[in-house]
Amino acid sequence: MKVLHIALSDRGGAGAGMLTQHLALLAQGIDSKVLVASKRTDLDSIFQVEPNQYVWGKGKTAQFLQKVARRMGLCLNRYDRYKRRVYKIRRQHWTEFSLPITTYDLSVHPLVEEADIINLHFVADFLDYESFFRKVHKPIVWTMRDENPGLGGFHYSSTKSELYSYFADLEDEFADIKLKALTSCEHLHIVALSQQMRNFCAQSQCFAGRPITIIPNAINADNFRPYRRHEARQHLGIGEDDLTIAFVSCAIEDERKGFRELALAVQQLEAQTSRPINVLCVGANEYNGPVPSNCRFFGHLNTPNDLSAVYSAADVFAAPSHQESFGKTVVEALCCGTPVVSTPVGIAPEIINERNGALYRIGDVDDLARALHDVFNRTYDKESIRREAREHFLPQSVAKQYIKLYEYVLASATSH
């Protein structure tokens, strides 16, 4: 069985989830390969698509005319026209908003042609829906890394609710393009990373009537392991008796990640205690809102060891996101034995309980402060927290679930 994963990149949150799944399948003896637009690893089983595989204009003359037109501010094709409209609005209302049409024609790639089954992942701004689903008739499994495939250009329904009026025409046009393209896909099986994502997919018009299976992200617990608390704190320069919260996000200023609410909740707690409260923040930082007095920004930490040190130094990991497809940082923290305070999004409501943390209401600063206070004042069995998380998200377990699904989808496609 030849499996081809298609993803925008092998890095980032979605890319890391795909990569762990791919490596776990290889470990199970599956012929698994990956096709990406941007390759950041040096793995031989991952291939970057050639930039000249366009839907239109493969010839040198067409490419030259396209380059000249762009310099003159002209749009020769629908992709450029849509791109200009999107960027014009995004300059005023920044958010992730992706086109369902691209300049790639992945249907003609040799890896696509040789695959028995294709597993799509995060493919925004890479997959051209119209050409791909019209030309590719192989069985497809689609792992939902966010909600974009079931929307128009938005990546999360919460953002759509907030900004729809500014993107209304484009959102509706893009959703219609996706819906029409997907009608050509005969053998499509959806994989949701959590029950919440399954509910979204079941309600999306794009996936009406499609089979959906829940398979969580694989997390390599050997990469995320607890450090001795005092050693981690000593390494980071944190007092042994300080109250410490960890927060991780690709972009700290992303309002969907909820750092503003965390900062306000910590300010409440600081007024209630004489003990210092440290907030350890990991991720790109262009945030300019309220900041706790003892807040340290580490930028991006590229190795699991560095992240594990931050998780292990914290008394609690805070996950105040408004929406998540999965929430892998929650699982990473648990794998380090650190209790979690989280909103009930992604995988959190399925795994967070009184033994490993607490849930609180989305956007409720007072409730977040209460939950953090409660966790600070409880004792947790860190080894038990780690063991439960490790067992639930083992890569080999997740790989076996995918293999079983691939076999089922292939058999179903053959019987039709």
Tell what function each PLM region has.
Residues 107-108, 134, 148, 160-191, ...:
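Membrane-proximal helix-turn-helix segments that form the acceptor-binding/catalytic region
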Residues 380-404, 408:
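A short, well-ordered alpha-helix in the C-terminal region of glycosyltransferases
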Residues 354, 358-365, 373-379:
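Conserved acidic donor-binding segment of nucleotide-sugar-dependent glycosyltransferases
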Residues 186, 191, 239-257, 263-266:
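Conserved donor-binding/catalytic core segment of Leloir-type glycosyltransferases
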Residues 339-342:
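Short hydrophobic beta-strand element within catalytic cores of glycosyltransferases
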Residues 283-305:
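Nucleotide-activated donor-binding/catalytic signature segment of Leloir-type glycosyltransferases, i.e.
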